[in-house]
Regions:
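N-terminal loops that bind phosphate or other acidic moieties
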Residues: 2-352
Length: 352
């Protein structure tokens, strides 16, 4: 699917369903607008699903797993072999997000979109673009064709999950070196200096952080990625996990499934999708604000406000999964609480 086709096919939210949801909130026997952002999210999802009467019975977490050639430059504390180990652990219910997903009732779908090795429990030939990206300190990370292939894989994953009955998709990632690629992409898209959006990732020393910033600065200076063209930016300094998640966000908009943003890497992908197809942003739900330097900046660029502020930076989709029970609680009030009329209480008026 081409970008022009996506722009043509992705439609705005259904205003009629949203208005019906707003009217129902007003009828519920509680102080008006007292659930704040939860009410807004329920209304937004009504617009996404084109009905004010919906449920969230099946929730999925798509975890894009990929390796990054830039780790050769010493910008990470650990080697890229860790990516494959953690990806395999997703299938064994032995990672942080696995434990959280059990509580939240979320099913995990790790995708090997670009790990440096095959992981039998995860790798599917049709979902793998490459065995890691190239080292962008020496050459562009990917070709445009590879970026588009990854985006299309993300879109197809949403289509498959919707066909399986999933009603909400959370986004996650695993890839050593992906805070470097995400910082590079964020620097370009936000038009800010690399040092303003680059953090220590999974625990870099001060010297390591300086190296990370230097590598990003040099790559941006060398390749001059076009901030008006996210595919160009991703191909030069991005990662396959970011590209795959960009596809998940676009797929959510295309197939009308709400997609939950996680943290830093996920927010970068969301911004890529929003820059490619602006209306797609209406289908994104924020979770938390990452403690990475660019976390708040990215949400601001997306014009979104986080529901959680937990000072998290773990990745894997942990923040996205954490917010799902909160959203479900808001929906439960919307669906189950009595109205003013049934409670025989005089309805509150919307005062101006």
């Amino acid at each position: 699917m081409t970008l022009e086709e996506l722009k043509k096919e992705i439609r705005p939210l259904d205003e009629t369903s949203m208005e019906q949801a707003r009217e129902h909130w007003i009828k519920i026997a509680k102080p008006l607008f007292s659930l704040g952002k939860l009410e807004d999210a329920v209304i937004q999802m009504a617009g996404i699903k084109e009905t004010p009467d919906y449920e969230l019975k099946k929730k999925a977490l798509v975890i894009m797993c990929a390796d990054n050639g830039i780790v050769e430059e010493g910008v990470t504390q650990t080697g890229q072999e860790v990516t494959a180990v953690v990806a395999d652990n997703f299938t064994k219910s032995s990672t942080s997000v696995c434990a959280m997903s059990k509580v939240a009732g979320v099913d995990l779908f790790p995708v090997d979109i670009g790990m440096s090795v095959n992981v039998p429990s995860v790798t599917v030939k049709e979902e793998k673009v490459a065995y890691g990206t190239r080292n962008f300190s020496k050459e562009p990370a990917m070709t445009r064709e590879e970026v588009w292939q990854a985006i299309e894989i993300g879109i197809r994953k949403v289509e498959q999950l919707k066909e399986q009955g999933y009603e909400m998709i959370a986004t996650g990632e695993m890839g050593i070196g992906n805070t470097t690629t995400s910082s590079a992409v964020a620097s370009v898209l936000l038009s800010v200096a690399p040092e303003q959006v680059t953090g220590r990732g999974a625990g870099l020393s001060s010297a390591g952080l300086e190296k990370k910033i230097s590598v990003i600065k040099d790559a941006i200076a060398n390749y001059q990625p076009d901030k008006e063209d996210p595919v160009d930016v991703l191909s030069k300094v991005g990662g396959l996990d970011i590209a795959g998640l960009t596809g998940v966000f676009l797929g959510g908009a295309l197939y009308r499934v709400p997609v939950v943003i996680d943290g830093f890497i996920s927010s970068v992908a969301a911004l890529c999708a929003a820059r490619m197809v602006p209306v797609s942003k209406s289908y994104f739900l924020p979770s938390h604000v990452s403690k990475e330097p660019a976390g708040a900046m990215l949400l601001e660029a997306l014009e979104l406000s986080p529901l959680l502020t937990c000072n998290m930076s773990l990745g894997e989709g942990t923040g996205a999964v954490a917010v799902i029970p909160v959203l479900e609680m808001g929906l439960s009030v919307y669906r189950e609480m009595t109205t003013f009329e049934k409670a025989k209480i005089e309805q509150y008026e919307v005062l101006k």
